[in-house]
Amino acid sequence: INLCLLLFLVLLNISCNSKRAGKKEDVEKDTYANPLFMEGANSSAIYHNGKYYYTHETNEQIYLWVTTDITDMAHSTCKEVWVPKDPSNSHNLWNPEIRNINGKWYIYFAADDGNTDNHQIYVIENDSPDPMQGEFRMKGAIMTNPDWNWGIHPSTFEHKGELYLLWS
């Protein structure tokens, strides 16, 4: 019985491995390749005046890319737009979201002081009509509740003329 069980397990292993290899090839053949970037979590993009502005998480600073063809990010222009100087918001910069609101550019993001328990939402502002020009300046932290509990993943929208911020 032991020999039969051993033989069965060997055959099962060979059978599973060959099926897995075939499936992997099929998946790779049918897998869609992201035209933006192979890396970059929590991305945000906006289309404004014929250009796409794109940003994604980098943990220590915020970069902004601009392109006329969102599927050709390899030829986009990139600019470092924010490097935190305040230790309270200089670590774990997550989920930057770029928005144009009333002619000004804003990037909302979450950051902390090195302890992820202290994550808060911050916003930076650029007065320039072109976010690749001018300078983004810290507007401050956004109090999501009186206890300053954890705030991450900011997302803004307008409804009936009022601006709203969602977060988790």
For the regions a protein language model found, what residue spans apply to each?
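Carbohydrate-active catalytic/glycan-binding domains of CAZyme proteins
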Residues: 16-168
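Bacterial Sec-dependent N-terminal signal peptides
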Residues: 1-24
